[in-house]
Amino acid sequence: MTFLKMKSLSFFFTILLSLSTLFTISNARKFNVGGSGAWVTNPPENYESWSGKNRFLVHDTLYFSYAKGADSVLEVNKADYDACNTKNPIKRVDDGDSEISLDRYGPFYFISGNEDNCKKGQKLNVVVISARIPSTAQSPHAAAPGSSTPGSMTPPGGAHSPKSSSPVSPTTSPPGSTTPPGGAHSPKSSSAVSPATSPPGSMAPKSGSPVSPTTSPPAPPKSTSPVSPSSAPMTSPPAPMAPKSSSTIPPSSAPMTSPPGSMAPKSSSPVSNSPTVSPSLAPGGSTSSSPSDSPSGSAMGPSGDGPSAAGDISTPAGAPGQKKSSANGMTVMSITTVLSLVLTIFLSA
């Protein structure tokens, strides 16, 4: 069975090859040398110029007409063509009406069998080109004008930097020092901040969470350095030292007393309800950082609509109530779930 299939395929390809050969031969053209076919000395049109005006393909034929016995046509190589050497021709015809087939592509060189006639210009140079099949398929790498290759999109402008996981909160500092820079975007803290006591000139943020009553110590001597809301940190002098607050303070609704002259910036973002303790500045001018409720993208600065100086800061006392409401909600949900289970068991019984 396989042999029969192979035989059929061979026969089919043989037929195709024969048809293509016949089609090529049928398209072959016959050229009269010099336009008239006359193979003579001093032709009306130079053979070289005539050859340059025509396009020769494989299987085309050249027709030479001359007096039989008096002349001939020799096919030679280029060196013999230039020197009109008739002693070692590649092919020779002398029947008077000769047709020579151009069976390959490339140059062909023909001269007269009479050396004197060759020197008088009776020679012909023909260049056969290979037939090209016109290609209709477009190159896959060709790109349309104005089009661009797909690539990655460039993000617009300055992309926001990722939110910092350790933002800086305002802490107690001696007179003349400022808070550390808060230029990075800081996420909203998951715990409320209880700012420590501040001597005069320090910045005390307004907290949205319950704080415990804290009394600031007597004001130390006034520093000669003005307080600036700038985000650039400054080294504080080692002499004044702020009291250290280290104990965990329970939430309450009592106000916090701020020393005269302190500024309270207004927080622009809400904070959550778990109080934590913010460590104060260590001796020697070093600053400490803790999670805070500072707004993202800028350092803390005094606000015009915040509480005035030398006044009590009242803080909302809604956090314990919210915790109590959450506990009540959890209790109600638990009771509802138990009742639903009991009702389901009762109905299924």
Swiss-Prot record:
A GO term, aspect molecular function: electron transfer activity
The residue range of the signal peptide is: 1-28
Q: How does it sit in the membrane?
A: Lipid-anchor; GPI-anchor
* Annotated Gene Ontology cellular component terms: apoplast; chloroplast; cytosol; plant-type vacuole; plasma membrane; secretory vesicle; side of membrane
Places the protein is found:
Cell membrane
Q: Which PROSITE patterns match?
A: PHYTOCYANIN
- List where Polar residues composition bias occurs: 249-260
Q: Where expressed (tissues)? A: Mostly expressed in leaves and roots, and, to a lower extent, in seedlings, stems and flowers, but barely in seeds.
Among Gene3D superfamilies, the record links this protein to: Cupredoxins - blue copper proteins
Q: Which residues form the Phytocyanin domain?
A: 29-130
- Residue ranges, compositional bias (Low complexity): 145-201, 224-234, 263-312
InterPro entries reported in the protein's UniProt record? Cupredoxin, ENL_dom, Phytocyanin-like, Phytocyanin_dom
> According to its UniProt record, which protein family does this protein belong to?
Belongs to the early nodulin-like (ENODL) family.
The name this protein goes by in its record: Early nodulin-like protein 2
